[in-house]
Curated annotation (Swiss-Prot):
Annotated binding of NADP(+), by residue: 716-719, 804-806, 875, 879
Species per Swiss-Prot/TrEMBL record: Heterobasidion annosum (Root rot fungus)
Gene that this polypeptide is encoded by: nps10
Binding-site residues, AMP: 261, 357-358, 362, 443-446
Region (Reductase (R) domain): 712-951
Residues modified to O-(pantetheine 4'-phosphoryl)serine: 621
Keyword flag ATP-binding: yes
Record bears the keyword Transferase: no
Adenylation (A) domain: annotated span: 38-451
Protein task: Adenylate-forming reductase, a natural product biosynthesis enzyme that resembles non-ribosomal peptide synthetases, yet serves to modify one substrate, rather than to condense two or more building blocks. The A-domain preferentially accepts phenylpyruvic acid and benzoic acid as substrate. The natural product of the enzyme is not yet known.
Entry's family note: Belongs to the adenylate-forming reductase family.
Domain Carrier: 586-668
MF annotations from Gene Ontology: ATP binding; oxidoreductase activity; phosphopantetheine binding
SUPFAM superfamilies: Acetyl-CoA synthetase-like (SSF56801), ACP-like (SSF47336), NAD(P)-binding Rossmann-fold domains (SSF51735)
Name this protein carries in UniProt: Adenylate-forming reductase Nps10
């Protein structure tokens, strides 16, 4: 049916919004398009907030309309450039607007800004859900005539698979071009950087031209692209004006809403019309995955008034009394996309939680009254919005189907019916009226039997049942799952295969018998509609299927007949998991790893490397649930572990086989407590709290010594050896206790210390200096593993503690570093037990590895950071914990501490640089590949002897945090030009070199032998070399070095260290490179 034109101007909406705002001006909604409204706000509501999120330090970051519109123009310029157009010229659209697909997992702010930027550039954006199969992506590309696709890295594999299919499809149009999706920092730049930017030339779009293409859920064979014109988008934007509450300035939490979803764009339109503020996760790449816990906590931290989410999250929150109490304090919780269980809703409203039941569709728009003013105890029922003209049409079973009629307030984007001579859209949704409240309606079901899950996803059972019904053992089948997390199927066997399904053995046999057909069905189904073997229910001979005269199953009657069995199978699945994977015979590390590997591979039907993020390999929420349930079943069956205390999100918190195995093994062996399932930032804070209480009092009883006595841990390492040599040479230092763990070998500590000094080009005889007392002990023990006499001697004499001993292992979890954290606390207690007037200063060598999750918008300052920034690997997390414990100790006690964030250390006076690190491995691989990588950018590597001198300088400073990197960074190009000269190897662009390394990895196969790795050790770090590199066009370029390490402010460090402040301190250069290469040749790492 042809479309219906929308008349201009739109009728003036009721004056319900923008009553009391000092920053928001209601825009003219009658004739402007949404992009024009954006520009209008940049001039008339410039300081009104559009987005907000929680900063790293816990503060709220607000993005105003003026700032966002500038970012939109940047996105538009970028888009025009990507399509080969001048950024300041209006594209020629006589042949129609190009359709630009967006296949990306981005934070909501970046995504919505990008969508609007594509519109400003003169093109039609088409957000494509990354949950689609590659076949569905091909279908959408063809149907929407997509000419260009913006792709984000995690979706590249999906797009490549789609392109392979496109190449083999002779009916497909030409292959779309592609570009890389921007990150937040590409679009939102500092005010200084933004000065002088001009707005893009923008041609007012026609009212009836396409503003955006949205696709349906893909519940049928393939999702359908649905175009919204600019006129339609403006109609939808006015929905809040037909509501009952003023939303201007209200903060709506959108953390659970992917912006490629219909509601993502609708919320942006509502914000433009009403001044609603959209709260989301802090922009970062990769984007934060929504979980039950982080959506709830982030929504509250951002002071949200309303939380918009999916029913499955609401159900989970309802089980937590503390959550429910908090939800009751909000304006309300809005849910949509699927049904909420009646018992759940009843529990919440009885606790005074206001529920807003949002109903609508991509085709017809939002149809329920949004954000009603009154608390509705009958939360399942809602009124139809005044914006919509509807009719309730009885069907053959006397149920009422909602039909949406075209009007100038609400014109459906799709028409499939005519009602009383008016074009209309028949929704297929069946409604029941409220028995006593006229005008209130409840959804009963669907005429097309579409199943709405609690996740908001939908399953259309017809095509899937048709596939299964072709199996010779199946007479008929019915899919079920309304209001549930996942789908199941009820199968009626043919007469010769009937059996009593209470016979577990026969049930298992029949499931195996029809499983190939189920797998065929699953291959056709979208991810959320796939059926697991345990979700196959078989009919009982005592309750046969009933059929209509047309020999079709009486769906509703049969589903109702099997209601108890359906409830029971969901209960069983919640309590169990895949029963066909045996539990390990023991829960040690090796056997647990094998078990987890088998579970992940069985559920995902593909092999995933132990260290890989299985969500990046396509694991969806349904598969995550099966992995979780299978693990919990095995733990319950074979251990005494208290699984009730494990977080629902533990799969997301440990998203690789290796990390998940480590977690599960610790739970099974009773090494984990109730906090083990919390998100990693919470784990870090919990560990800080555990070791930041009950500090001993400091009781001074002796005068301060005239000279310093230092307790130095880790003196046999590269940095420790250099520190030791400098302390020995210092006239202000009377004694050094060089503290190290006992060696597994029988080599005496004196010999180990001499060897360590010699290896770094230092005088080995220093180990026997009269200033040095070599101590073997264990800081993880309360008495440091030494005699009472020696401990007392150290306690009464030391003036400083330099804690430099910490294992470097990026594969260990935070829990694995708890002994080291405990050791730091023991050293804090030792300091506080000192009889001196001031406790010995504790200097702790932290790491720049803490800054894994920082938004590189400026150099990192010498101030405390939040746990979220340091969430990465256990090593970086443990360093943050250590730094924060010291800060807490300084707050609660007289302790003075200095946390030194040590950067990348390079070789010292003799060039000694550990061969296992990334740079030596890179250069060794370059020799093998006969090419060195070159690129723009700086490196702030600092020679280990210079870093040691700075740390000794810091002993006399009162600053609590120091950033320790080279104060005079060198360029990557200068360093690698020196390598090229010394090694006689040509330079090639970094990306070209990376391609050579990748090719060598393919040639080496999945399991390269030891000889290959010895000659080409960069194979082990290929992924890191790819992900760490920061291109000069990347937004992070200004505030990161070439390999992605942040740039650092060094105000405190330069003030405290004469070594660093010395203008004569040389940059790294060719002389350093020669020393490194000579050392690597000397130890046999490089060929002579």
């Amino acid at each position: 049916m042809s479309s219906v034109s929308i008349q201009i101007p739109l009728p003036t909406p009721p004056p319900t919004q923008a009553h009391n705002s000092q920053t928001f001006c209601a825009p003219p909604l009658g004739s402007l398009t949404l992009p024009e409204v954006f520009d209008w706000h940049s001039k008339n509501s410039p300081n009104h907030p559009l987005y907000s999120y929680i900063n790293i330090d816990g503060s709220i970051r607000t993005i105003t309309w003026a700032e966002s519109v500038r970012a939109v123009h940047r996105a538009a310029r970028r888009m025009r450039t990507e399509l080969g157009l001048s950024s300041d010229s209006v594209p020629d659209l006589t042949a129609g607007k190009p359709v630009v697909g967006i296949l990306a997992v981005l934070d909501s702010i970046t995504y919505s800004t990008l969508v609007t930027g594509v519109q400003y550039a003169g093109f039609t954006p088409f957000p494509i859900s990354p949950r689609n199969s590659h076949a569905a992506v091909v279908h959408l590309i063809n149907k929407a005539f997509v000419s260009h696709i913006i792709v984000e890295e995690s979706c590249r594999g999906l797009l490549e698979d789609a392109f392979q299919s496109l190449k083999s499809d002779l009916t497909s149009p030409s292959m779309p071009t592609t570009s890389v999706a921007p990150v937040f920092e590409d679009l939102y730049v500092s005010s200084d950087s933004a000065q002088g930017e001009a707005s893009v030339a923008f041609e007012t779009p026609a009212w009836d031209s396409n503003a955006i293409i949205i696709h349906s859920s893909g519940s049928t064979a393939f999702p359908k692209p649905i175009a919204w014109t600019h006129g339609r988008a403006m109609q939808l934007s006015t929905v809040p004006w037909y509501g009952e509450r003023d939303l201007t300035g209200k903060r709506m939490a959108c953390h659970a809403m992917p912006m490629y979803h219909t509601m993502g764009y609708l919320l942006l339109a509502w914000a433009a019309s009403s001044g609603l503020v959209l709260n989301g996760f802090r922009p970062q790449s990769p984007a934060t995955k929504s979980t039950i816990e982080n959506v709830f906590s982030a929504s509250l931290e951002a002071h949200s008034d309303i939380i918009f989410t999916v029913p499955s999250f609401v159900e989970a929150w309802s089980k937590n009394p503390a959550y429910v109490k908090t939800l009751a304090e909000l304006d309300g919780v809005m849910f949509g996309g699927g049904p909420l269980g009646k018992q759940v809703g009843d529990v919440l409203v009885s606790a005074n939680v206001t529920l807003f039941n949002l109903y609508g569709s991509t085709e017809a728009g939002v149809l329920s009254s949004t954000v009603p003013a009154d608390f509705n105890i009958d939360w399942e029922y809602f009124r139809i919005s005044d914006i919509a003209k509807v009719a309730f049409v009885p069907n053959e079973e006397n149920k009422l189907e909602l039909v949406v009629l075209s009007s100038n307030l609400n014109t459906p984007s799709v028409f499939n019916a005519v009602y009383e001579d008016v074009p209309a859209y028949a929704t297929s949704d069946l409604f029941e009226p409220h028995p006593t409240k006229p005008g209130y309606w409840k959804i009963f079901g669907r005429t097309d039997d579409q199943i709405m899950h609690s996740t908001g996803e939908k399953t259309n059972p017809g095509p899937l049942e048709h596939i299964l019904n072709q199996d010779p053992h199946v007479r008929a089948s019915l899919m079920f799952g309304r209001g549930q997390f996942q789908a199941g199927v009820l199968v009626d066997p043919t007469s010769e295969y009937r059996f009593d399904p209470s016979d577990e053995e026969k049930l298992a046999e029949f499931r195996n018998l029809i499983w190939p057909s189920v797998e065929e069905m699953n291959a056709y189904a979208p991810q959320h509609s796939r059926v697991f073997k345990e979700m196959i229910l078989v009919s009982s001979p005592s309750k046969p299927f009933t059929f209509t005269a047309k020999n079709s199953v009486r769906r509703q009657a049969v589903i109702q007949e099997y209601d108890d069995e359906i409830k029971a199978i969901y209960f069983a699945v919640d309590e169990t998991g895949r029963a066909d994977i045996p539990s390990p015979t023991a829960w040690d590390s090796a056997k647990t790893l094998g078990f987890i590997r088998a579970v992940v591979q069985k559920v995902m039907k593909k092999e995933v490397q132990d260290g890989d993020d299985f969500f990046q390999h396509g694991c969806d929420s349904l598969q995550a649930t099966w992995i979780r349930n299978t693990i919990l079943r095995s733990l319950k069956d074979s251990t005494d572990a208290n699984t009730q205390d494990i977080s629902n999100s533990f799969i997301y918190q440990h998203p690789s086989v290796a990390s998940l195995a480590s977690f599960v093994s610790s739970v099974a062996q009773g090494q984990n407590n109730i906090n083990s399932g919390l998100d990693r930032a919470q784990e870090m804070n919990i560990m800080v709290a555990r070791y930041s209480k009950d500090f001993p009092p400091h009781v001074p009883s002796a005068p301060q010594p005239s000279k310093d006595t230092i307790l130095l841990t880790g003196s046999t390492g590269a940095l420790g050896s250099n520190i030791l040599a400098l302390l020995i040479a210092s006239p202000s230092v009377a004694r050094i206790y060089a503290f190290n763990r006992k060696s597994r070998s029988s080599i005496p500590l004196l010999d180990r210390q001499k060897s360590a000094l010699l290896e770094r080009g230092l005088d080995p005889s220093l180990a026997a200096s009269k200033k040095v007392v070599l101590v073997e002990g264990d800081v993880t023990k309360q008495d440091l593993g030494i005699s009472t006499e020696l401990l007392s001697e150290i306690r009464v004499s030391i003036t400083h503690i330099i804690h430099n001993a910490w294992p470097v292992n990026f594969n260990l979890s935070l829990e694995s570093f708890e002994p080291q954290v405990k050791g730091l606390r023991h050293l804090v207690d030792l300091s506080l037990s000192s009889p001196h007037p001031s406790p010995p200063r504790v200097l702790f060598t932290a790491s720049i590895g803490m800054f894994n999750d920082i938004t590189r918008a400026e150099p990192v300052k010498e101030v405390p950071i939040g746990a979220n920034v340091a969430v990465s690997n256990g090593y970086g997390e443990s360093k943050w914990v250590g730094e924060t414990i010291l800060a807490e100790a300084a707050k609660q006690t007289p302790l003075r501490s200095t946390s030194i964030r040590v950067g990348q250390l390079s070789g010292g006076i003799n060039g000694a640089w550990t061969t296992a690190e990334w740079l030596p491995s890179l250069v060794r691989s370059a020799i093998h590949l006969k090419a060195l990588p070159d690129c723009e950018g700086d490196v702030s590597w600092i020679p280990v002897n210079v870093a040691a001198a700075a740390i000794v300088d810091f002993c006399q400073s009162d600053s609590s945090i120091m950033n320790l990197v080279h104060p005079r960074p060198a360029t990557w190009s200068s360093i690698f030009s020196a390598f090229a000269s010394v090694l006689n190897i040509p330079l090639v662009p970094y990306t070209e070199w990376l391609a050579l390394l990748r090719k060598s990895a393919e040639d080496a196969g999945d399991a390269p032998d030891a000889d290959s790795l010895q000659q080409n050790p960069g194979l082990r770090l290929l992924d890191w070399y790819h992900s760490a590199f920061v291109h000069e066009n990347d937004s992070a370029y200004q505030y990161a070095d070439t390999m992605g390490f942040p740039k650092f402010d060094m105000t405190n460090s330069l003030r405290a260290s004469g070594t660093l402040a010395d203008e004569g301190l040389p940059q790294l250069g060719e002389s350093d490179v020669k020393l490194w290469v000579d050392y690597w040749k000397k130890v046999g790492f490089f060929p002579a």
